From Swiss-Prot:
Enzyme Commission number(s) of this protein: 2.1.2.11
Gene Ontology CC terms, in alphabetical order: cytoplasm
CDD domains: KPHMT-like
Record protein name field: 3-methyl-2-oxobutanoate hydroxymethyltransferase
Binding site for 3-methyl-2-oxobutanoate: D49, S50, D88, K118
Annotated compartments: Cytoplasm
Similarity annotation: Belongs to the PanB family.
Quaternary structure and partners: Homodecamer; pentamer of dimers.
HAMAP family linked to this entry: PanB
Organism: Brucella suis (strain ATCC 23445 / NCTC 10510)
Reactions that this protein is recorded to catalyse: 3-methyl-2-oxobutanoate + (6R)-5,10-methylene-5,6,7,8-tetrahydrofolate + H2O = 2-dehydropantoate + (6S)-5,6,7,8-tetrahydrofolate
Length: 275
């Protein structure tokens, strides 16, 4: 009998080498059961601070804490063996100084066992990215629309329509690449600019509301699965519609309980003969 084939976990270096090759498949994951389902199909799983909105009902990602990210990072690591797992650095955990960023990123790496961290920001964060990378922490960048800065940009909207925005996003992506990030998310950016940046920089771009020309794509899993119902961004395609199925299952369960059809004989334990 031949031994089972063991797939090694993908590393940030492997992800970086996928630039211009096979598109990078990425989704968010927050829990062990879902991570197990996604792991065989994804190159990179992102433990995103979007969990604040899709799991906890927050209005934005700003209230997500480092402890929350570590707890969910641990859960995702328990459910994966193949995908590269990256954990978001939440708002306030890295912006103060590069030393603060290293201290908190090191804690994330140590306590979760993840493969790297993601942080938002462009030119203003390049020094921090370089500081982390030089100290052994792989960094996944994030430019374009940055949800942690939603209060300063006037809400969730696409960027790159004016010359100032185009120049800023282009410079941001170049700065993050030059600082040593292994890849960069481009979010909510007009298609021609995302396409241009992908050709311009030498690390993979992972698009979300960007361009099919990006080196990979990422979506929030709850959006992709049709579980998150509060709103649907234009860039989301629902590959399933699980929310109605969950509701229907709960309705059927409630009906059977109230009618005393559940549990049935096959779901209960009988007494042993002679007991």
């Amino acid at each position: 009998m031949s031994a089972p084939v063991t797939r090694k976990r993908l590393t940030p270096k492997v992800i970086q080498a996928m630039k211009g090759e096979c598109p990078i498949v990425s989704l968010t994951a927050y829990t062990t059961p879902v991570a197990r389902l996604l792991d065989p199909h994804c190159d990179l799983l992102l433990v995103g601070d979007s969990l604040g909105m899709v799991l906890y009902g927050m209005e934005s990602t700003l209230a997500v804490t480092l402890d929350m990210m570590i707890m969910h990072g641990q859960a995702v690591m328990r459910g994966t063996s193949h995908a590269c797992v990256i954990v978001d650095m939440p708002f306030g955990s890295y912006q103060e100084s590069k030393e603060q960023a290293f201290r908190n990123a090191a804690r994330v790496m140590q306590e979760t066992g993840c493969d790297g961290v993601k942080l938002e920001g462009g030119e203003e964060m390049a020094e921090t990215v370089a500081f982390l990378v030089r100290r052994g922490i792989p960094v996944f960048g994030h430019v374009g629309l940055m949800p942690q800065q939603v209060n300063t940009v006037g809400g969730f909207r696409s960027l790159g329509r004016g010359d100032d925005e185009v120049g800023k996003i282009r410079r941001d992506a170049q700065a993050i690449a030059q600082a040593g990030a292994f890849a960069v998310v481009i979010e909510g950016t007009v298609e021609p600019l995302a396409r241009e940046i992908t050709a311009l920089i030498d690390i993979p771009t992972v698009g979300i509301g960007a361009s099919s020309a990006c080196d990979g794509q990422v979506l929030v899993s709850d959006d992709m699965l049709g579980l998150f119902q509060d709103f649907t961004p234009r860039f989301v395609k629902r590959f399933a519609h699980l929310a109605p199925q969950v509701s229907q299952a709960a309705e059927a369960y409630a009906e059977e309980v109230r009618a005393r059809r559940f549990p049935g004989p096959e779901h209960v334990f009988g007494a042993k003969p002679g007991a």
